[in-house]
């Protein structure tokens, strides 16, 4: 079972997900205006860069946002259609942030808007129906698709999230109506605004974590902020859900109480131990991340050499996925597993 743990401080908020007492996911957000991913703005085209097929957009912040032409028009548009569409300096645009400011670079934005709800993601500019790949039951996928096709407005897209598995038509419709109301409010503010401005602010880390991860397999949500606790309870009036939300009032800091602080310290280490005695060595360069798998002290306890290697590699595959998620590592990743002779064993490692 999972536990969601929240540590809310004046400077920053930290959220963690534990699975059987072990750190599975972690996120941190500073309590300032620097994190703006998924915020929606009214912007003005400031400068067009034909050679890059891109433009700079004034969204009312200290640095202009950057947008590729391919992100300026609906995803359904073809290359030919995009080339025929005309942009001009001073033109107003409705954009959503997809990447925060970094160093001297402004945020990256798109005109393909998406609004996340509890059960669904609304895409107002694209006609599309999708169901999360994590819902694998074909009968359930078909049921959800039928419901979406009945309730989705023409010309808009709706993606059903994993947490929607098993929910009723009424619950999905209620979530959609909330998202449509939010979208209508954004459009009204866009029409009224005379200059670049913020139109919609994405939920903070606490509420995003609850929205995205508070599912039936979560045993408890524990936060050390009364304000955050009360906000979560307001979202879940059902006593069955609310009973799983708890305010932590202990004297020991909450991340120490749940041994999360110790786990976070290990995330700073280059060497990651494996349960068997093997280890991972994680190295970063400017271009890529390299992960080396070592058997180290593990001898296999009487197993054959190939069985020993397979066991270490299988442990490593699971732990590597966990480390990539916790360390937020992306881009090019090279993994050097211990050599295996049998192709079937190699395939099994890839599947794990």
List the model feature ranges, each with a label:
Residues 1-352:
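DE-rich acidic low-complexity regions and acidic surface loops
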């Amino acid at each position: 079972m999972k536990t969601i743990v929240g540590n809310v401080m004046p400077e920053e908020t930290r959220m963690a997900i534990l699975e059987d007492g072990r750190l599975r996911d972690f996120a941190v957000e500073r309590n300032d205006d620097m994190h703006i991913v998924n915020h929606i703005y009214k912007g003005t085209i400031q400068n067009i860069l034909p050679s890059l097929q891109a433009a700079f957009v004034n969204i009312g912040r200290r640095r202009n946002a950057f947008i590729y032409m391919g992100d300026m028009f609906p995803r359904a548009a073809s290359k030919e259609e995009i080339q025929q569409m005309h942009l001009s300096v001073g033109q107003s645009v409705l954009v959503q942030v997809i990447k925060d400011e970094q160093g001297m670079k402004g945020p990256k934005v798109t005109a393909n808007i998406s609004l996340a709800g509890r059960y669904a993601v609304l895409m107002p500019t694209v006609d599309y129906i999708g169901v999360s790949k994590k819902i694998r039951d074909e009968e359930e996928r078909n049921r959800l698709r039928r419901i979406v096709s009945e309730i989705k407005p023409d010309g808009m897209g709706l993606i059903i999230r994993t947490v929607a598995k098993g929910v009723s038509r009424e619950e999905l419709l209620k979530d959609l109506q909330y998202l449509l109301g939010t979208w209508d409010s954004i459009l009204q503010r866009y029409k009224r605004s005379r200059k670049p401005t913020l139109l919609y602010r994405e939920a903070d880390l606490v509420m995003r974590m609850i929205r995205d991860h508070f599912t039936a397999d979560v045993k408890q949500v524990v936060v050390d902020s009364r304000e955050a606790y009360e906000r979560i309870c307001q979202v879940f009036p059902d006593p069955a859900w609310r009973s799983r939300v708890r305010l932590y009032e202990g004297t020991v800091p909450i991340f120490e109480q749940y041994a999360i602080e110790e786990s976070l310290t290990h995330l700073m280490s280059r060497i990651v131990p494996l349960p068997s005695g093997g280890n991972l060595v994680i190295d970063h360069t400017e271009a890529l991340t390299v992960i080396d798998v070592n058997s180290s002290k593990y001898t296999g306890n009487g197993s054959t050499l190939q069985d020993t290697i397979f066991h270490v590699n299988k442990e490593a595959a699971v732990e590597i996925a966990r480390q990539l998620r916790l360390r937020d590592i992306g881009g090019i990743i090279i993994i050097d597993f211990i050599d295996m002779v049998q192709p079937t064993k190699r395939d099994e490692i890839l599947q794990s």
